[in-house]
Amino acid sequence: ADLLAGPQVLHLHALGVVARKLGKAGGLSLTLRDPDEKPVSSASIDFTLGDSTVRGYPDQDGKLELGLPPGSWKVSVSDHGRARLELSLEVEDGKSIRRELAMDRQSGVRFSVTKQDGSSTPCKVQFIGVEGTPSPNLGPGDRAHGCKDQYHSEKGNFSVALDPGKYKLILTRGIEHDHVEKTITVPKGQYVEVKSALKRSVKTPGWVSTDFHNHSTPSGDNVCGTADRLINLAAEHIEFAPTTEHNRIIDWTPYIERLGLQGEISTIPGMELTGSGPHLNAFPLTPKHHHQDNGAPQWVKDPRINALNLRNHPGHHPSGWVHINHPDMIENFVDR
């Protein structure tokens, strides 16, 4: 069987397991180190055979061990802020290869971002390449710590690896704070220090900034991690965000506490009751642990019944909130 038929990206370790199961595989062990002999664990390693590529990642010790089908493999090792490494490997059935690879010293930016009082603040930074420097792609768009050309942080002290070049930085924390722009040059193999304070120019005593409709992985319709979602909200200066995952009553408070964001954002347990028609948010709701969906009600077609079920739910506070999302005026509000 041709395990690599056609252009595709496969799970690297699964490929090795299948190759061994079929009886033809060679072993490979790669170790990545920087000039100080410290492990490089943040790299991506692409293996190409013909027109097919598989990707792997080293562990925290900078090691990647796997099996590969026999053949002439091209290997490309890349990491933000380091030069790419290219090598060729001839994998033979029943034989093992060991390689130690030395990567360049990493370049990037170290941030110290504060509020006006000097305390650390959640924030977002966007990197825009200028004068021929390409804008970076730091990762998938639903990840806080490196998403496309942005980085969202739960605190003001953080580092971002960047390839050498010239960048415009835009530091923000939502619409109530002034943004800060800086242009920097990142030298090869060095980190640049950036310090800045974000001024809150819009005063809102007695009011809080809220977002009543958010989701993360437990909702089942997206792959944004819960911690990533909360970091994103805090970086945009959302001060209150009820927990509104699809069809289950959840409380984000433990995540907020683990991230150290108690002073920046708060939540209460709730849910979005969801089906093939109207969607409704409700909070607060008390989770009923060890019950299906933590005791959430079941969705029905009639939006009036859903609203009543949420309002009358045993865990719903009498002064709580129920609203309908993205309403269809004909389906949901027509006279009956």
Region spans (language model):
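Short, acidic Ser/Thr/Gly-rich low-complexity loop/linker segments typical of extracellular
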Residues: P39-A43, L49-G67, E131-L162
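Catalytic cores of extracellular degradative/oxidative enzymes
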Residues: G174-E176, V180, P205-R336
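Structured interaction patches on ligand/partner-binding surfaces of diverse proteins
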Residues: H80-R98, Y151-E154, S159, I175-E193
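Extracellular beta-sheet/turn segments enriched in Thr/Pro/Gly and aliphatic residues
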Residues: L10-K21, L89-Q106, R110, I184-P205
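Surface-exposed loops/turns
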Residues: Q60, P69-P70, D93, D163-G165, ...
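Terminal accessory/anchoring regions of large secretory-pathway or extracellular enzymes
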Residues: A1-P58
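A short, amphipathic beta-strand motif
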Residues: G26-P35, L101, S107-D117, V125-F127, ...
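A short, solvent-exposed beta-strand micro-motif common in secreted/extracellular proteins
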Residues: P70-G81, V125, P164-G174
